[in-house]
Swiss-Prot record:
It catalyses: Hydrolyzes the peptide bond -P2-(S-farnesyl or geranylgeranyl)C-P1'-P2'-P3'-COOH where P1' and P2' are amino acids with aliphatic sidechains and P3' is any C-terminal residue. The record marks 248, 252 as: Transition state stabilizer. GO terms for molecular function: metalloendopeptidase activity. It is a multi-pass membrane protein. Its EC number is 3.4.26.1. Residues 1-3, 66-74, 127-148, 230-237, 297-315 are lumenal. The gene is RCE1. Belongs to the peptidase U48 family. InterPro entries: Rce1 (IPR039731), Rce1/LyrA-like_dom (IPR003675). Residues 24-44, 96-105, 170-208, 259-275 are cytoplasmic. The keyword Metal-binding does not apply. This is CAAX prenyl protease 2. It comes from the Eukaryota. Keywords: Endoplasmic reticulum, Hydrolase, Membrane, Pheromone response, Protease, Transmembrane, Transmembrane helix.
Length: 315
């Protein structure tokens, strides 16, 4: 059972990320994808982030029990924001292990997305009119991509993985904790935090109430599930926050797998017949098989590629 003071800290961390999104001076009705709105929100979230990097460790140090007291310094370092620093180890500076953990987590994600990754490669190899550099320019070099692929993964993982998990670990006796609690209770805070998008959609008036409700429920569900993944990674890698950030960023980039881009190009944009059409049809079947294979392999890759024995957070 959570102590009330611990619950208040967890609630504060969750709410403190959402509140700055609405504490803007933008005109009423300004949409979330308006560049001015994005800049204003990122500025205010940055201020809140810097404040919480000191406030949350301070609260943890003040509220931790006398039998398992944690200092402000240890609470701050335990957030995992310093690359290569493993706070729980006798020799905390382990940069080679840090790089190894990052590499293994990326390999795990590439296995999950093996279908879309191979489809991307084949599309650019077999379509002479395509340009990776042009795709990169249009996809990444703008403020929306900076928010989605860099700013959001960093800030959300610091708030909803690092700060929430370390609050559990530092304020609740480990004898009263289970890994299931660590993986799913903080993830629920992360999922519910996305409910505010329903308010934005209502303000825009572009969707029906039923559509907003269904979309919000689905968003809460998949963000809670994704939160469980990043909490698992944080624990298994001994508090390597940057593994969680990289995974979050890559998942935002990849998104939910859609139809094969190669198949769409050669069946809709530049329709081919004969042998090429048959080969594209075969690839399309292979693509969907790889999607299923990547999902099935996730359980095994999580166990084999995430973390190293001796570096994990133990209860």
């Amino acid at each position: 059972m959570l102590q009330f003071s611990t619950f208040l800290v967890l609630l504060y961390i969750s709410i403190s990320y959402v509140l700055p999104l609405y504490a803007t001076s933008q005109p009423e009705g300004s949409k979330r994808d308006n560049p001015r709105t994005i800049k204003s929100r990122m500025q205010k979230l940055t201020i809140m982030l810097i404040s919480n990097l000191f406030l949350v460790p301070f609260l943890q140090s003040q509220l931790s029990s006398t039998t398992s007291h944690i200092s402000f310094k240890d609470a701050f370092l335990g957030l995992g924001i310093i690359p290569g620093y493993y706070a729980a180890l006798p020799n905390p500076w382990q940069f080679s292990q840090f790089v190894k953990d990052l590499t293994k987590c990326v390999a795990m994600l590439l296995t999950l997305y093996c279908g879309p990754v191979l489809d991307f490669v084949l599309y650019h190899l077999l379509n002479p009119k395509s340009s990776i550099l042009e795709d990169f320019y249009h996809e990444f070099l703008n403020i929306w991509s900076f928010r989605n692929f860099i700013f959001a993964p960093i800030t959300e993982e610091i708030f909803y993985t690092s700060m929430l998990l370390t609050t559990y670990l530092n304020l609740i006796p480990h004898s009263q904790l289970s890994y299931q609690q660590l993986f799913w209770q903080p993830s629920l805070f992360f999922g519910l935090a996305h409910a505010h998008h329903a308010y934005e959609q209502l303000q825009e008036g572009s969707m029906t109430t039923v559509s907003i409700l269904l979309t919000t429920c689905f968003q809460i569900l998949y963000t809670t599930l994704f939160g469980g993944l990043t909490k698992f990674v944080f624990v298994r890698t001994g508090g390597n926050l940057w593994c969680c950030i990289i995974l979050h960023a890559l998942c935002n980039i990849m998104g939910f797998p859609g139809p094969s881009r190669l198949n769409l190009h050669f069946t809709v944009v530049d329709k081919k017949a004969g042998r090429i059409s048959k080969l594209v049809s075969i690839w399309n079947k292979c693509y969907f098989a790889l999607l299923v294979l990547g999902l099935i392999s996730l359980k095994d890759t999580l166990q084999t590629l995430v973390g190293t024995p001796g570096y994990r957070i133990t209860l």
